[in-house]
């Protein structure tokens, strides 16, 4: 693959900022540095997702970053969205900020497309069961 379309890379990186806070419990860091990045990443996720006719939030276009095909509803995307939204909700509660945003994040979080198991017993990487049983990639995406 010579290029990659991965709009969730920013929110994925924001989850590492939460990891730093989670380890240090440095509320000053969370307030001044972490929360602005985490909350803006959660806002991006809310803006990027759309409600599929089945009622779940998903994204299109969407890719499995290490496997390439473009479809809707990549599990990697849902995993990152779920994590950054949960972290934004928790950080908002800790800091007592953005109650209106927190409710929006929770609403999207509660309606994210769930993880699915495919016909081969695998965690599906896309909303449709298009995984290739002959794919010898060394691992599934980082979730």
Language-model features, listed with the residues they occupy:
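Active-site core of glycosidic bond-cleaving carbohydrate-active enzymes
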Residues: 2-15, 19-24, 32, 75-143
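Hydrophobic alpha-helical bundle architecture
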Residues: 22-39, 43
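Long, well-ordered core segments of solenoidal/helical folds
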Residues: 36-53, 108-120
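Short, flexible coil/linker segments at or flanking structured domains
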Residues: 26, 47, 69, 133-136
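Short coil/turn segments at secondary-structure junctions
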Residues: 21, 25, 29, 65-68, ...
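Acidic/histidine-rich catalytic neighborhood
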Residues: 39-94
């Amino acid at each position: 693959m010579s290029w990659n379309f991965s709009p969730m890379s920013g929110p994925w990186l924001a989850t590492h900022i939460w990891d730093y806070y989670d380890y240090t419990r440095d509320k000053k860091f969370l307030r001044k540095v972490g929360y602005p990045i985490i909350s803006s990443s959660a806002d991006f996720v809310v803006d990027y997702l759309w409600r599929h006719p089945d009622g779940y939030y998903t994204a299109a276009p969407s890719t499995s970053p290490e496997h390439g095909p473009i479809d809707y509803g990549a599990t990697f995307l849902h995993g990152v969205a779920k994590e950054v939204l949960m972290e934004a909700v928790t950080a908002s509660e800790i800091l007592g900020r953005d109650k209106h945003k927190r409710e929006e994040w929770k609403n999207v979080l509660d309606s994210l497309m769930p993880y699915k198991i495919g016909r081969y017993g695998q965690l599906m990487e896309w909303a449709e069961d298009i995984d290739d049983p002959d794919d010898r990639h060394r691992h599934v995406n980082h979730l």
